[in-house]
């Protein structure tokens, strides 16, 4: 007999979300037994991160929302900024440590969810289920059996793709000596940053008060920067573009998100599935993941409760993924100017509609209307050449250290 109906591997956003949904008792439906396996402290455990998403409805993780906004601002390289109201949508920010505290509090009260701290060495199919091979902090090994396994760990390699770019970023949590931020608006894309020879870059500001914000430098390109390169880029944006003046750096956050048109497998065995970013929850053209993984885990939890096959659904529609493939190709080939494209879209499309489009929540005629506001010729050429392009492997870079808390820096 399996030790659990479900084993969830990894306690990041996807793993915690699925465990949280399965811990809830629903009258008339099954409540599966769950083992959540979290990596021990060290390099395998995700560092603190910031997640953003948008929604008009209340959600199960609202208590973890650190801040929310209904105004977004996009700044082209020159000229006036584009600003709009996102109503009824709200752009929300969650810090992973707040999210983990909320979920852990609820899981601790669940009689059907058990947590283990161990390194997962292998996940393998067996007749009627799967085995998870574990090693604990003392070096002891054991095998955990389950009917279903949901693995949220990052894959060791990516499937071959026609186009792969990296969205890589480095940010400072800053506190300024004087009020310089507008806490009512997010600086979503500020293209006044130096543009790389290949790809695009922009600044990103999430203000939580007039004197505090997360200030990030972001690139869409083929290669990450060095740690010194990231520090220089954020310092230039904070000091020379935003002109923050006297400031303290309270913490730093670094990350790399893969933007690819590769088909990401969501099932790796008869009883083994991938969820979250590992299961294709990341929107290829934007890097946003949180909303997609919530759609996946909601569907998986519902299937398990009803005794159905719990294969995670695609987090994004085929239509959305095809449009993303065209955009990635157009950016990677240099046919379109990234800052000009995004500035033009935000200037010509209502903010709320564009956010719904970026989350795959628009109808075909709305997608067509938005597509006609892009450079049609270059986008059409990119679409026509895609079927002829070979798929090539992509070597994942070694990500820089992320989410560390350095000594406070004053400038």
Task: For the regions a language model picked out, list residue spans one by one.
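Predominantly flavin-linked oxidoreductase catalytic cores and closely associated redox partners
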Residues: 21, 109-247, 260-263
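C-terminal helical "tail/cap" subdomain of flavin- and related membrane-associated enzymes
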Residues: 298-411
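N-terminal FAD cofactor-binding segment of flavoenzymes
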Residues: 21-79, 98, 170
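Short, well-ordered alpha-helices that flank and scaffold nucleotide-derived cofactor binding pockets
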Residues: 20, 24, 105, 207, ...
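Short hydrophobic core segments
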Residues: 7-9, 37, 143-155, 272-273, ...
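A conserved beta-strand/loop capping segment in the N-terminal third of enzymes
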Residues: 53-118, 122-128
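N-terminal Rossmann-like FAD-binding beta1-loop-alpha1 element of flavoenzymes
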Residues: 1-35
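FAD/FMN-dependent oxidoreductases across multiple families
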Residues: 194-197, 221-300, 308
């Amino acid at each position: 007999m399996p030790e659990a109906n479900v084993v969830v591997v990894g306690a990041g956003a996807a793993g915690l979300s699925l465990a949280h949904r399965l811990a809830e008792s629903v009258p008339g439906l099954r409540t599966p037994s769950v083992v959540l396996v979290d990596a021990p402290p060290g390099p395998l455990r995700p560092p603190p991160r910031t997640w953003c998403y948008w929604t008009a409805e209340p959600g199960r993780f609202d208590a973890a929302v650190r801040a929310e906004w209904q105004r977004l601002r996009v700044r082209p390289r020159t000229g006036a900024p584009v600003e709009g109201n996102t109503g009824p949508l709200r752009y929300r920010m969650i810090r992973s440590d707040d999210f983990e505290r909320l979920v852990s509090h609820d899981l601790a009260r669940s009689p059907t969810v058990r947590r283990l701290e161990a390194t997962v060495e292998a996940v393998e199919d067996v007749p009627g289920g799967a085995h998870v091979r574990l090693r604990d902090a003392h070096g002891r090994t054991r095998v955990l059996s389950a009917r279903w396994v949901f693995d949220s760990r990052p894959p060791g390699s990516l499937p071959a793709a026609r186009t792969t770019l990296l969205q890589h970023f480095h940010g400072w949590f800053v506190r300024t000596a004087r009020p310089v931020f507008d806490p009512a608006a997010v600086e979503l894309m500020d293209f006044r940053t130096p543009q790389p020879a290949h790809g695009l870059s922009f600044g990103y500001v999430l203000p939580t008060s007039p004197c505090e914000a997360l200030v990030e430098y972001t690139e869409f390109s083929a290669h990450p920067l060095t740690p010194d390169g990231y520090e220089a880029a954020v310092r230039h944006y904070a000091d020379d573009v935003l002109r923050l003046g006297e400031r303290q750096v309270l913490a730093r956050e670094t990350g790399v998100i893969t933007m690819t048109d590769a088909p990401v497998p969501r099932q790796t065995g008869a009883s083994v599935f991938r969820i979250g970013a590992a299961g294709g929850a990341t929107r290829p053209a934007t890097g946003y993941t949180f909303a997609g993984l919530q759609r996946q885990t909601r569907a998986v939890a519902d299937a398990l409760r009803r005794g159905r096959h719990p294969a995670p659904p695609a987090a994004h529609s085929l239509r959305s993924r095809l449009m993303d493939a065209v955009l990635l190709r157009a950016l990677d080939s240099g046919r379109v100017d990234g800052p000009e494209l995004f500035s033009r879209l935000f200037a010509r499309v209502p903010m709320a509609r564009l956010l719904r489009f970026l989350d795959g929540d628009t109808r075909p005629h709305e997608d067509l209307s938005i597509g006609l506001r892009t450079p049609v010729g270059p986008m059409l050429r990119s679409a026509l050449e895609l079927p002829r392009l070979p798929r090539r492997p992509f070597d994942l870079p070694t990500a820089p250290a992320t989410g560390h808390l350095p000594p406070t820096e004053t400038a």
